[in-house]
Amino acid sequence: MKIINTNNADFKQEFENILARAKTDIKEVSSIVTSIIDEIVEDGNEALKNHIEKFDKWEVKSDEELQISKDDMKKAYENIDEKLKEALHIAYDRIKTYHEKQLPKSWIDFEKNGTILGQKVTPVDRAGLYIPGGKAAYPSSLLMNAIPAIVAGVEEIVVCTPTPNNEVNELLLAACHICGIEKAFKVGGASAVAAMAYGTETIPKVDVITGPGNIFVATAKKLVFGEVHIDMIAGPSEIGILADSTAKPKYLAIDLLSQAEHDEMASSIMITVDEEVAKQTSIEVENYLQTLSREEIARKSIEDRGAIIVASSMDEAIELMNEIAPEHLEVMTANSFELLPKIKHAGAIFLGENTPEPIGDYIAGPNHTLPTGSTAKFYSPLNVENFLKKSSIINFSKQAIDELGEACALLADTEGLTAHAKSVRVRLEDN
């Protein structure tokens, strides 16, 4: 694994290259995705069937075949191993408990002059969840997307997942059963996003679409934004690690690889203040690579998008990591909590050597749907508020409009909005 020192003459350029590699360019697939969306809008279910036959390699003979039945979900749940059931329920309970703490409250404030101001928090009516599918389906993604919607109080949750060769992952169906999902469809890719955004004869139009996916899914979400709300536009997985001399290289190495094995495009960056830790971690990465079932993918990721940076101080290391703004950030230092106030940008922050990133993927409780590509500078993890909206509440008494009305009318006058001003003054005249 390549080691870069911040004292290198060309470090600035090397670091800019690292940042550039983390970006996802969707331009190359935009025209393809636009065509897919147009076909769904124009032809609905017929286009869905054609896309499934083309991309997932099975023939849909009726509209009914697009939907996954609740009976299938229940049977899948009953068929899985008891220990897996227990693990899914543990994850469900922990995720739900965490997200319940995020719920904002409606509020009302009464002023002395009789003004009543407030905020009303309301869930969206219908949420669409995109869940990657096929044999390598991720039931954890279903839990992480469905539970915040459930906690928010969304009345109708729609799930779309691809089913290559008409195969649906049993664990994913079991997770659907645990979450009480009633509408799930065998539709994937940009087609699924378009179907949920615009609706078809079978798939209802939703208000918000969340969930991870490949570049086609990400592009589709970007293109339908405005027709519906979306959570974020996520790219390949990322991990950043801050380490000092106390960090164990074997922990650092396997944690870097935990993201590298996801995808050849995944990014794994460690910044340390200890050159010996950097060298030993690089050696451990190579040792672990040879033991992985997805060695080829992980090796390509580490070679193309992995790096160990040796910084001159922890402050410099944190400054660089804030610039990277990684999806996942592990802090393996002697004083991880003391560094927390200085960390500004990361999707999720894992403190201490006993908190590897996979803990957050499955069982800790916080959401694992996180911003990538440095968008943690302005995006948050998926949360309950993605499924909520807020309305302002305003009520003026006679006394309140008498006190504040003329100021309001004057501001309207300055903007040349005569009807606005008259709307207030006609009431002042009556009073």
Per-segment meaning from a language model:
Residues 2-7, 183-188, 308-313:
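Short acidic-hydrophobic, aromatic-tinged amphipathic segments that line or gate anion-handling sites
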Residues 232-304, 308:
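A conserved active-site cap/scaffold subdomain adjacent to cofactor or substrate pockets
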Residues 180-251, 255-267:
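Conserved NAD(P)+-binding/catalytic subdomain of aldehyde/semialdehyde dehydrogenases
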Residues 109-174:
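Conserved small-residue-rich beta-alpha loop and adjacent elements
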Residues 155-164, 268-274, 352:
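Short internal beta-strands
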Residues 323-431:
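C-terminal core of ALDH-fold dehydrogenases
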Residues 1-125:
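N-terminal Rossmann-like NAD(P)+-binding subdomain of aldehyde/semialdehyde dehydrogenases
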